[in-house]
Amino acid sequence: MSKIGKRAILLLLALPIGFNVMAQETKKPTLEELIPGGESYRYADNLYGLQWWGDECIKPGVDTLYSIQPKTGKETMVITREQINKVLEENKAGKLSHLYSVSFPWADKPQMLFKIAGKFIVYDFKSNQVVSTLKPKDGADNEDYCAASGNVAYTIGNNLYVNEKAVTNEPEGIVCGQTVHRNEFGINKGTFWSPKGNLLAFYRMDESMVTQYPLVDITARVGEVNNVRYPMAGMTSHQVKVGIYNPATGKSIYLNAGDPTDRYFTNISWSPDEKSLYLIEVNRDQNHAKLCQYNAETGEPMGVLYEEMHPKYVEPQNAIVFLPWDPTKFIYQSQRDGYNHLYLFDANAANMKGETYNSANGGTYFQAGKVKQLTKGNWLVSDVLGFNTKRKEIIFTAVEGLRSGHFAVNVSNGKISQPFENCKESEHSGMLNASGTYLIDRYSTKDQPRIINLVDTKNFKETANLLTAESPYEGYQMPSIETGTIKAADGTTDLHYRLMKPANFDPAKKYPVIVYVYGGPHAQCVTGGWQNGARGWDTYMAGKGYIMFTIDNRGSSNRGLAFENATFRRLGIEEGKDQVKGVEFLKSLSYVDSERIGVHGWSFGGHMTTALMLRYPEIFKVGVAGGPVIDWGYYEVMYGERYMDTPESNPEGYKEC
């Protein structure tokens, strides 16, 4: 055969492959592929259930459990599901369908904990035997297993139980052992075991005085009415007490905190010796927080260790944490210098004389004893991961804007492992081992959906890469993403934006724009993580030919207290002004069709969508508001009054917003 003939055959053989690649590269992801819950949703690879057993990393799978040495990354098989199920069947304890839900709460014991058919099972994976089983009563909810004592707290209906014993017997309208204050102030549970498991602190919420509102279920053939107690801004709120239950005696006491009317109790924690219970009390106006100590045996107050006041609001969200090597010292998180940072406190300060000082954030604070600020800078501590006792260090995660990373601060000399400025744009979370020497670092970047590394906390360098996930949309036609900053309506503050352009973008064309907005507290839409925080819906609409634009206005999170509380008593107003600045930026772009700009958002974003449509009808041609807050007077007491005060004290603000 001639060379020309061979070349022709090779070309023909290559054509289908080339056509197939071209077809794949021009394929746009569907809504089902982009939205979680879709039947064909494409997600990045992950390692589920990754955790520590003491200082060994545990990697579960469906059928096999592996341990990973953090220094080398070497994997060793620990046990198989088949081995466990054989023993479980012999004990008539059921079967595990996978190993992802297994946990290792005992750092010094070869034991794991899992749950089958409502039973908590402790299993020794060295001797291959069931150590213990514990089954709460039927209907159990809010389960809280204590690894130190082997007891489990839970609720049935509105009452609290420990093991099989009822701790409370309250009528309808009084709820025990569940979250209170509408899950504000960092509250996400209602029971708190002491370090050794000898005592259980719990919430008791009396909401019998709160107005009931009917929710009608129309999905049934005959409609049903379910009443919910919902305290709206300015109205009567529920009253909370904190109890302490002793499983050994079966008796409970309640803290003698005084009249609970218009007071919030949050951030509950124990002293290492279980003799004291600590909590942070916030007043109804939410402008005064007090760290209080109580006697765990009698419930009597032992003193106030710290107070923080601000003319706008204070919002404590983290319980104190004691140093594992010194039970007389604890870590307190505060925004008193304008950013959330770590402070070292003396636990004996309740008996000391204190003074009041002016804080850098515009408020004041009262403290007794010696207090040392451990972290400082125009960035925030977002999570305390734990301690390295040998090096006397606190390991934590920090964030500011699009950058985040892990750090260590030495409690003795205040030295931090690296400057925050070394952080790159990314989104990190971490899990520390028992000794604080290594951590599991999960993070993403704009172009990388997920990376999981084991990291040495001595220098925060990777020792083993466990996963580098590829984009689940490799080969698809994807939009391009740009980020940058513009000035807020105050003319000085930088705001981060994300601009998503359709694939095959043509700068000579005019494109319609959808502004996706949230804009409220405790949320950041533009991040340094995967696709800069863009959602699948954004990608889908970009595929339909829209430019997608998002800006984090003042009032959103991870930029410091002044950035967040700039919207105080005027929710939606200042945020709206910043969103308009974003639109002005859009209109400066030659490829934006300024006559076709829409806005969309959910929840607080629904409120923003409605407000923008009504206040700036000349800008936005269409708006879609999902679950919007239309009138802040109908929102809950805790959230609404923090940012707006009461309708009685701020009538013009409520009317304007």
PLM regions and their residue ranges:
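Beta-propeller folds
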Residues: V21-S417, T437-Y438, K446-Q448
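C-terminal outer-membrane/trafficking sorting elements
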Residues: K3, F19-M22
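Bacterial N-terminal signal peptides that target proteins for export
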Residues: M1-I9
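Extended, charged, solvent-exposed helical/coil segments
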Residues: L385, E421, S429-L432
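Serine-hydrolase catalytic core recognition
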Residues: Q212, E274, H428-C657
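Active-site donor-binding loop signature of nucleotide-sugar glycosyltransferases
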Residues: P36, T80-R81, K135-P136, N169, ...
